């Protein structure tokens, strides 16, 4: 193909995703019943994990993405431990079509952050006197779809019929 003057058209520049920074915004670990909570438990504790993703534009083509992970381990009668982590990154994203930008920021960016957040949580739990908590991989596509469905339902409820 040529562009009319005999020269081939220039290819569009490829999409780019650069990690400019990664950091812990907030970390909390609580072991409220220590040292009693460190004793062997009669049964496996129930562990509940909540994961959310937030993002905001910082400048043109730059976004801060925050991965929020909260968890609790509960025994038969009391809280064993709890933690909260907000782990964030600053990303530069260029040459991405506008319709693909939101999914990229909310799916791929947290996917890049997750292994680091997982390590921080495992270390905090271990340092709290427990075996390291190894979080299972997260389906960020499913989380994105779930959040988009929830937002659509909320918007539909908010709009008058």
UniProtKB/Swiss-Prot annotation:
Signal peptide: none annotated. Keywords: Chaperone, Cytoplasm, Protein transport, Translocation, Transport. Pfam families: SecB. Its main location: cytoplasm. Transmembrane segments: none annotated. GO terms for cellular component: cytoplasm. One of its GO terms (biological process) is protein transport. Belongs to the SecB family. The keyword Cell membrane does not apply. GO terms for molecular function: unfolded protein binding. This is Protein-export protein SecB. It comes from the Bacteria. One of the proteins required for the normal export of preproteins out of the cell cytoplasm. It is a molecular chaperone that binds to a subset of precursor proteins, maintaining them in a translocation-competent state. It also specifically binds to its receptor SecA. NCBIfam families: PRK05751.1-3, secB. Homotetramer, a dimer of dimers. One homotetramer interacts with 1 SecA dimer. It is found in: Cytoplasm.
């Amino acid at each position: 193909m040529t562009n009319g003057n005999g020269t081939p058209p220039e290819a569009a520049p490829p999409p780019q995703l650069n990690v400019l920074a990664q950091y812990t915004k907030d970390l909390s670990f609580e072991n409220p019943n220590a040292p009693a909570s460190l004793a062997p438990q009669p049964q496996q504790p129930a562990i509940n994990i909540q994961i959310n993703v937030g993002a905001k534009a910082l400048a043109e083509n730059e976004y801060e993405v925050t991965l929020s992970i909260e968890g609790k381990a509960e025994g038969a009668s009391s809280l064993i431990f709890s933690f909260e982590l907000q782990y964030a990154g600053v990303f530069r994203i260029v040459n991405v079509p506008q319709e693909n930008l939101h999914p990229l920021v909310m799916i791929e960016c947290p996917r890049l952050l997750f292994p680091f957040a997982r390590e921080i949580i495992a270390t905090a739990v271990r340092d709290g006197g427990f075996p390291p908590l190894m979080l299972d991989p997260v389906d960020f596509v499913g989380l994105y779809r779930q959040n988009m469905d929830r937002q659509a339902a909320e918007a539909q409820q908010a709009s008058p019929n």
